[in-house]
Amino acid sequence: MFLKRYKKLIALSSVILISCFLLLAIYGKVFHPSEKLKKLEYWVSFFEIFFISSLFIYRYNWYIWVITALIFASFAGYSIFWYSIKLPCACMGTLIPHASLLYFFLDLIFFVLSLSVTYLLQVKLSALYFWAFLGCIFFLIGYAFAEKVYQKFILL
């Protein structure tokens, strides 16, 4: 198959694309943090820096792409919660306000991209269905986490 021949190039390109958006998110969280979520945003930024490093190091291993898919599924759940209550998700701090739906679609695209790279790295299609199902569960976990954050930090 044409794509499998270029799987290493596709994996590297995917890492670069995802990293660009995550670096923008880190910049927004560190230099333009939401006042009520400042501590959470610093911790998430630290995690995202570690995550970008892991992506670059292990980009040719299928398991990092499964982890990436699950992370973006939970990010999608987080951002859709904020969109549903008409508040910004602060996914990039206050750098780009009121764009929760944009972040949801970006997270969804990165979820699908991660599963696609997982498939290119020789994971069977049946296993991919399992990871997609698990991604739906992580979507719900991200949604529940956002609701908890809303109750604890915003409704004070």
Regions flagged by a language model, labelled:
Residues 1-156:
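Membrane-interfacial helix-loop segments of redox and metal-homeostasis proteins
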